[in-house]
Every structure is written in structure tokens, then in C-alpha cells.
Amino acid sequence: MEQVPSTGRLVQITVTEGYDLKGFKGDTPVTFIRAEFNQVVLGDSAKITVSPEGSAKYNFTSSFEFNPEGGITLDDLAHKPVFLTVTEVLPKEKKQKEEKTLILGQAVVDLLPLLEGQSSFQTTVPLHPVQGSPLETPRSSAKQCSLEVKVLVAEPLLTTAQISGGNLLKVTLEAAYSVPESFIPTGPGQNYMVGLQVPSLGEKDYPILFKNGTLKLGGEREPVPRPKKWPIANILAPGANNIPDAFIVGGPYEEEEGELNHPEDSEFRNQAECIKKRIIWDLESRCYLDPSAVVSFQKRIADCRLWPVEITRVPLVTVPKGKAGKTEKTDEEGQLSFHGVAYVNMVPLLYPGVKRIRGAFHVYPYLDSVVHEKTKCLLSLFRDIGHHLIHNNKIGGINSLLSKQAVSKNLKEDKPVKEKDIDGRPRPGDVQAPSIKSQSSDTPLEGEPPLSHNPEGQQYVEAGTYIVLEIQLDKALVPKRMPEELARRVKEMIPPRPPLTRRTGGAQKAVSDYHTQIKNISRAILDEYYRMFGKQVAKLESDMDSETLEEQKCQLSYELNCSGKYFAFKEQLKHAVVKIVREKYLKTTSFESQEELQTFISELYVFLVDQMHVALNQTMPDDVQGTIATIFTSSEQLRLFAFEAEVNENFEMAAAYYKERLVREPQNLDHWLDYGVFCLLTEDNIKAQECFRKALSLNQSHIHSLLLCGVLAVLLENYEQAEIFFEDATCLEPTNVVAWTLLGLYYEIQNNDIRMEMAFHEASKQLQAQMLQAQVTKQKSAGVVEDVEERGKRESSLGPWGITNGSATAIKVEAPAGPGAALSILDKFLEESSKLQSDSQEPILTTQTWDPSINQKPSNTFIKEIPTKKEACYERTISFVVDASEMHFIFLRLGLIYLEEKEYEKAKKTYMQACKRSPSCLTWLGLGIACYRLEELTEAEDALSEANALNNYNAEVWAYLALVCLKVGRQLEAEQAYKYMIKLKLKDEALLAEIHTLQETVGFGNPSF
């Protein structure tokens, strides 16, 4: 063999051994292997006798030269395999001059690992039997016959730059469905071809052709998974057509990237893929893209967006016998018909991390003006660039009709090298041929359709033809940040989570908690006692006899047991007792014996009784009247108070409530989010950012914290950080519609149209999936109640921390019409629809999102615009079995309506319900106003006192307290309340005038008198 030129590198293929072989003439045939690559025979092995076990040691090495400058290129290695044909040598018979041979099977070696940077690899490839081969019936071992193959190059074929910057493009053409009715399987043979171009060497375009599609009648769906096939003809063994480990798997239409992926397209596609005629290719073609081609590919996608994929058919020409090596033109050659084009949106390949797009694409008639407008492509692959591709269109091969150079002389051949490539792909250097159509002539060449009219191509549109195409890259054109990197970047940007405060005095804390529970329960029992026997009973306690006290005790015990309060008190105390057992007595395991348990219980009982007495003595000293009860407020109550402070635009008080929540529970993420939203309302963006980042430091996987941090980063123009936050959110929760939408808005700000399109497309996709799931759930639900509950869950998922910035109660403001302010939408609708019937209101109410607290107007405007219909709407709302999302504000609005209409009994009832559900300063104030107007002064004073205890900075509360004191004749208290009212600057002029009038009537209450 000749020496290999210095510019080339030798690729060696060694077949070491074969397994489970057998021949036509027994289980120990004489066989040899022929290696072929690129339609050139690389060599034959020695003749080896197969052992009785079916194995044969060939140790046969063949090679070819890799020379990208003019021989075998990287692209050849990408889409052309090495064929290993095993042939049996039959024994010579008498008077037989030459040996007879029969082909047993063919194996395929994919050289793709060489393009992945490997310099050698070893593999076991199956030996596919030819038709009629004895290998079709496996041996008793039931193993498929195979060959052990090693591939070796002296050094890697790719440089480091090529490995990092290059890419491998795989294009799979599955089928064309719903083809025109004029396509019939009988009559003259037709070659159905599809082609597209991709950048190859720099700016050069490389045609990829798929030829000889099979026209099939409808009747059944194509099976999945089914193997992808090599784009090479004349493969001897049927199984060798299949690319190893490459399958067409299909998938739901909704997950495709094409044009027919909407729910309304499902019926048409099902009919087309089951009933109608189709053309099947199932071919995968590969193309290596060097680094410059990758850059050109990216630039072309960004500039053109749509990629033309042409489809046509040309008649097959049968070669007469004895002229197989000649290329004779006939009258039928060169006739390009049914020239169509599909526009493939390649933009998704520029989305971060996307390596594959697959979908169905409509086929349209090929018209120059339309193609140029959509794709900026001036020339047609079939008609202009490759007009001569339709020549030499003979039966029996997916033939590339451009000439190609012969393989290096050192390759061993047993027949001349043909000037035709059988893979359906021209050489990269050949595509530089000028267009066959003269640039100065408007006259089409023979077989070229008119440029502005294509009646045959129009049949594709009439039939609804579409092709199913897959384009896959080995590496994404735009790398996507890994979740680990995003998490690391987020961790770098947020402050470290502060360490939890070390718990000290566990036993002391447990006893203190027990004291607190005893005090709370004792107050509750005392309140029940007062309710049953009156508050004045304490003054008469010394004058009562023992029988009366015992009778009251029995009545109280009976009431506590019957109402279930006794059981509730025990449950309330249970947790504190458990903490004492664990923290003070260090008992965390079960007792070994019953005696030990009883001893411990006795000891514990004595301790608990003693501590109960200690707590009761602290709570109830001898001078009971001198004790001032401390009102305990929960975190949710503080949150509600903060919202009400926002309503009154008392932001200082609201901030105090939010900070109180943070002091109590600094590790509660929601508290930080609420305070951050409040800071946004007051336009303190720096403080809001601190709060959101603090929340994120507590849980770096919390989606809403990430999104809010991203929003603040945009507001503060920290765009790089914003992208990190939004990307991390979409990575942690890929189905979150809000996260994708915010990411799209961010890219819109950055004028990044491609990524904006990607994010909005994903948001729309996830939203449609959620809507479909909600629709299915709704159909399964039985009755209105389940439907309302399910809607409530969807509402709650929009905002996990409740009402957002702009929160307000109905007493102060009202929301204008707009997205999310459903109550105001309802109000406006009712104002404009005075003839609305009551039976039509319920469906409206059941479909509204009850959130009256966003972007609201001052209460005086709200009061002036209240129509009569609103009262009925709110009454119906509170009568539903399932509550609306914010019933607190519904009660406040309805109570305000009643007060304005002077229906004080209804107002009292409504505010009492509000006080039971979620007591606040405003609910007690409303109840106090209603009681005062009903002349129930004692109840009014009690309610106003409760309101004052919750917020003693409310001027209206002090005003009504002054009115009550004036009515009952308590001069000192009246003057004191009036002073606080003036100090807090009461704004209600009518109420102030009423106080002055009453002061003049009674003659006191105003220190200026």
C-alpha cells in the first residue's frame, strides 16, 4: 500500500471477531469480510472458517484516508457509515473453475464518535442478515450474530477549537401527509424529493437532499417508535438501513414547534396521519458545522427566521440493460413538477438550551416573490442552484447528481469508482456552481415553473399537505445556564441567611408558656362567668352564701361541657404540658412499666397544679379591678391592621405593624414579602429590595421571592441580576406562567426579540395547559360548590402573601375598573345595567375574583356612587356557602352601605359578623357607630373601647367615644376623648359639627367653654 500523504490521516477499521455465525452449508462455513466506505471497497479479509460455536477470529484491518482538503471530509464521516459485508465461500464442485460466494449479512459501523473528539473506540455491531440468509434463523443461543469492531486514528480528527466551537446538525424528514390526490402509486415512477440548505464552510451553503420517498395509501397510522434510516441506497441487508439507536418517537401535537400544534388541529392531523395518502422517508441526514459555519448558521437564523424547505417530484428514468454506467438524457428528464415549499421557523434553535425542534409545517406553492419575502432567499435549491440535480435520475438509489472526486489512490478497489454519490448529498465544494438561470434573462429554463404562478404547487394548499421534520443539534447554539450556576449566582447576590438564635432556657420557656396558657384560659372562663351571671357579681361575691356559689359553679361547669369549651381548653393546654414533659423532665421515650408511668403522672400533676396557682395569682390579685388586660394580637391581625392603616394613608402606623410582625417572627418569609410590598407602595425601592432579598435568603427556592427580586432589580436598573433571578425562577418552576411572562417582559425591555418570543411562547403554552387542566377538573366537578372551591384555589395561587400593594378597605377607598379589581368591575357593570335581573346576578358574582382592595378611590366618592343594586349583591355574597377570598372587606362595604342608608340594625348585625371573623379597629368602630345610632350606649362604649384598644390613633374612634360620654353625662371622659380627637385631626366635618352641637346642648365636653 502506498504511503499516506502528510496532509491526510489514516482511519483504521479492525474487525477482530464474529459471533453466532452460520452459513448455507452448515454451522462451520468459510467466510470473509469486505469493508466499504463511501461506495469504495476498502479491502477483503482472509477466508476464515467459523468454529462450531459460531465464532470466527478475523483480525482484519482496513483503512481509508481522511483528508479535508480534497478527500474524505468531516461531513462524510458524519453521515456515511462503514459497511462490513460477511460472505460465505461455498466449496468448489467438480469442474468448477471459480469459487461461488453467497452474502450472509451486512453490519454498519457509525463513525460519529470520531467527530466527538475520540481517537479510538470499540463497539459490537449487529450483523443484519440479507433476505434468504441462514442468519435470519438464530442459533440455539438466541443471540443475534454480531461483529467486534475497533476504530482507530493516530490522533483526534478535530482540534480543540473545532470540538468546542463546532456542531453536528441532524435533519430527520419523517413524512409528508395529506398529499394531493393526483399523487398515485401506479403509472410512471416518481422520485419524491425534499431539500434544504445549511451553511457549511463559512458562508457557503450545503444542500441536504432527501430522495425517493415512498408514496403510501392511507389506512393506518405509521408506527412509533420506528427506526431512522441512512440516506444511502443499495444497502444489501434490510436491517442495515436503520441507524443504530436512532428512532422516530413522535409525541403530542401540543409539544411540537411547528404550525399544526393547536388543539383545533388535532382532528385534521389524526385524519391525515391515519386515513389520507402520505409520502414516507424516515431518513436522517447529518452535517458537520465547523465553528465559522455555526456562527453563520446563527446569524442566518436571526436574520431570516424562516427557513425554506423545498419539496418536488421528478419522473424516474429506467436505465436500459447494458447501459448502467452511462448517463443518457431522455425527454422525461429534468421535469420539475409539484414544486412546493415549507417555511420552518428556526428561531427556537436560538432559545437558550434548545437543541431540537420538531413539528408539522404546511406546504405552499413555490413562488419566488413569496419565498424571498419570507426567507430572503433568492435562489431555489432544486430549480436554480441544483437544476442539474434532477438529471441522472435513475431508479435504484438516493443519488447525488453532482460530481465528486475519487477517493485517494491508496484505497483498495475491485471496481471503478462511480462519479455518483449515493447519499443524496452534494459535495461542499460543488454548491458554488452559478445559477443555471441567466441573471439577465427572465425566461425560465426547461422544466422550470413560472415564477409568479404555480398551479401544481397550489394543490398542496388545497389538499392541506404538511411535512413532519425534525432538526437537532449536538449542542445548543445558545447555552443555557445550569441550575447549579443560577443557584450559585443567586446565593452570591443575596445576603447570607442569619443563623438562628440559639435557644436558651428551654425548661424555663416551657413553664412560662404554661403560665401564659393558664392565664388565657382563666380569662376565657371568667368571661364566660360574666356572660352568665353579669359583671357586677364580683362585687357581691362576699355577700353570697356557699350554696349560691356552688350552684353557679355547677351551672358554669355544665355550660363549659355542653358547649365544648372545656374540651377546647384542654386541647389548648396540651401543647404546653407536652413541652414541660420534654424540656423540664426530659421525657421523650415511652415508660418501661405502668408503675413508672403512674409515679411520673402523680409528680407531674403536683407540679402543674402548683404552677397553675402561681399563674392565677399573677393574673388575679386581690384587686381585680386594677388589672389591665393585655390584648394579644396574632400575626394575621397585625397584617390586617397594617392594611387598614394603608387605607387611611397612615403609612407610619402601617410600617409599625409590619415591623412588629418581623420582630415577632423574623424567620417568616411571608412577613418580609408583605413589608417589601408595602415599601413598594411607599416608593422606597431600596428598602423593598432589602426585604425581598431577605425573604430569598430564608428560602432560595421560593419562586415569588425570586420574581420580586427580579422586578426590583429591573426598577433599579440592575439588568444582569434581574435576568439571573427570572431565569432561576423559570428553572425551578418551569410551569410558572408569571415567571415566564416576567422573563419575556425583561427581554422586551432589553430589545431581545428572539428570547422575548421564547419566553412569551412558553408562558402561553403553560397557560393553555393550565386552562385545559382547569377545564377538565371543572367538567369532573359536581355542582356549583366544587366549581367555586376550585376557582378559589386558582385565585389563591396568584398571590401567596394575600393582598398586594395598594391594599385598602371599603370604608376608605374603592377600586376602579381594571384587571384584578373585580368588585369595581361589578360595581360599574351594575351602574350601567339598571335593568339587570336578580337571577342573572348570581352567575356574575360566582365568576368574580373578590379582591376589592387594589387601586381604590376615596370613600366619599364610593358612597356617592352606591346604587341600590349593590346592597343586594353584597348580601348575596355573604349568603354563599363558600366564602369569597376577602370576606373582611365585603362585610365592611356592606356595613358602610347600611350606615349610609340608616339601616342601623342591619349594620350592627353585619359588623358583629365581621368582629367575630376578623376583629379590627374598623370593625369595632362600625359596630360602635351602629350601636350609638340605635341609642345602645353601653354596647357602643364597649365596641368603641375595643376599637380604641386595637388602635388609639384613630380620630373617628375618639369622636364617637366623646359622643357616648356626652350622652351618658361623663364630663371628664368626654373632654379627654375630645382632646385626643382634636389632636389627631378629625377630618369628618359633619361628625365634628354633631359633636359641637351636642356639647352645646349638654353644656360640657369642650375645654374651651
Curated annotation (Swiss-Prot):
Residues 410-457 are annotated as: Disordered. TPR repeats lie at residues 498-531, 635-668, 669-702, 704-736, 888-921, 923-954, 956-988. Signal peptide: none annotated. Keywords: Cell projection, Cilium, Cytoplasm, Cytoskeleton, Flagellum, Repeat, TPR repeat. Residues 410-428 have a biased composition (Basic and acidic residues). Its main location: other. Belongs to the CFAP70 family. The conserved TPR domains are dispensable for ciliary targeting. The N-terminal half is important for cilary localization and/or binding to the axoneme. This is Cilia- and flagella-associated protein 70. It comes from Macaca fascicularis (Crab-eating macaque). The lineage of its organism: Eukaryota, Metazoa, Chordata, Craniata, Vertebrata.
